[in-house]
Amino acid sequence: VIFIKREFEAYLDELASITILLPTERHHGESTHFTLLFQEERHQLQIIERNQLADYVKYRCETKIPILIGSKYMVEDEHGRKTDLQIGAVIRTEAFDEAYYYDGEDLGTTYYPGETVFTLWAPTATAVKIKLNAPDSNELIYYSLIREEKGIWRITVQGDLEGFLYTYLVCVNLVWREAVDPYATAVTINSEAGVIISKEKINLPKIPLPPFRRPTDAIIYELHIRDFSSHPKSGMNQKGKYAAFSEQPAYSSEVGITGLPYIQELGVTHVELLPVNDYGGVDEAEPEKAYNWGYNPLLFNVPEGSYALDANDPYSRILELKQLITTFHQHELRVIIDVVYNHVYVREDSAFEKIVPGYYFRHDVHGMPSNGTGVGNDIASERKMVHKFILDSIKHWLTEYDVDGFRFDLMGILDIQTMNAIKSLVDTHKPGAILLGEGWELNTPLQTDRKAMIINAKKMPGIAFFNDMVRDSIKGSTFNLFDRGFSLGNTHKTQALKQSLSGSINFDPHFKGLFLEPTQSVNYVESHDNHTMWDKMALCVSHEDEKIRQSRQMLATSIILLAQGIPFLHAGQEFFRTKKGEENSYKSPDSVNWFDWERKQKYSNEVEYFKGLIQLRKSHGAFRFSTSLEIKKHLTFPIEKGHLLMCRLNDVKSYGKWNQLLVIFHNGLQTETVALPNDSEWDVLVYEAKVSFNAVQKVKKEIMVGPISTVVLGQY
């Protein structure tokens, strides 16, 4: 960026309002009048307000002529000094949004073998050029784009441009900036330029799965592309790559079945992938030298290159990610992708900021970028063209990659209108796709009643939220390491646990409920963020031996899998995943983050228990009601005393094999005798960390419940 020396500065802050800053070092910052110059025309500005600042006098002026944004204007003071009229805060006004909103479907590139059309939205630019670089050539070709209505710039370039690299050169406020197309769908290594590709070469056959019926039928398993295969004993050859998931069969002589077959054996329904779109923090040429979770978005419509077999080949990452999703679908597993529309990696370097400076991000009352995300910038999703970009991006992932859902990072930054529009779009293109997100309240300049956060969940039916109340009631606070939840022996969390088990709905007068329906509650005790449960327990209950801690984690996981709502599981939770005590492993080495396949083998009995609980949940609809009415009709809590909580599911024969189900959660260290509700026999389905569907064991009247355990009984 070249520094422009100006005698004074003038900014268009509203469509008819100009702010002028005159330095006091000359004429004491005084001017009795200002003139707006446009081509050969001269128009007097009306001074509305004058304020003395430390080094400037600030004037607010109004113009009676319409300003054509994207045209060159000059402002002249009474002393004959001139400066260019810069684009200021006008771009963050509703009037600007209305005037320059473009609803076309052609942003980006449209490739044909004989020509390519380039379309860019850059309303504040006074000139736009495209820089083309032929493949395997150093020759650069420049073309000037033609400005059209609504701030659109367009050009059609003749010839077959497949494989050509391209970037835009955009002039705003006299400064030229080079940027990658934010609508690019293919890029060079490390995203230095967009690449023109042929869609015919990336068309893989899609595997149609029937629409997913109910969100509460889902069992979500969260994992990171690189983590899953990077361990030396993973049995996968393409370690850290998309391609690892397509290796069949994946097997290690030391740890048995691995890879995708292992996920399929677990019985989960959806795999949620940490971000797979292009991100910063890892050099795609040498990915082994750094690690990152992927929450540093660079380009939103391009797969990350560090997971590709050949990041230099723009087709590689696209085809390999598509093949990964196709392979999952072949195995009747669905794919949710983690999307990060709340911020960019570095605001100043982003394509958004270079092409339309100041538009795509929120600013505070002082005009400074807001930082509710904690990473230096907040995406302004409420602005029309930001809203459109997000919806266009969602549509791209649905139609091009055939994903089955989206997890929205820091969703509380986004606005409710955008999230509901996404829900409508997704329902149209992929009925049954799941939308879930982090509904935390964040300090961003958007009205509270417009934020897509958990306290506004009832305004967003059909969108699910990570339920931190569930997490804290079972495990204990994430932010207070020594706070213990029910599974860690805290009997004071029993009331909160009842709310968690009932889907966090309006279950009784004591709890007004977070959600309209249980389909909005994502129930979890751990995720990629913060300590794993195993690592928290190493600090929180360090005095307890390992066997007791295993029982506590198994109790916690059983609650997640038997509660009303959507169960969410962190990959490796089934074998007590550890990150060696690291609380925030977002850039820690593979040895901290990898999926430790040796633990899977070491804790094979516990993994089998995990599988059994999943099968139990899937076998009976009473564990996964989709409406609050069903929960209120069938769920009661007949016993709540000390370390014990009993749930009863009544009259549920229409949902599965058993008419009555009892679930007992026990967090105490002593065996307890529990009286059963009637004199008839009960099938023992879950007992002593084993799951059985064959009714090998039956009980009547009472049952002995062992320390820190879960018991499930069924009656016809």
Write out the residue ranges for each language-model feature.
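The feature marks proteins involved in alpha-glucan
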Residues: 2-14, 51-117, 139-140, 148-247
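C-terminal beta-strand-rich structural cap/linker in extracellular carbohydrate-active enzymes
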Residues: 122, 162-166, 696-716
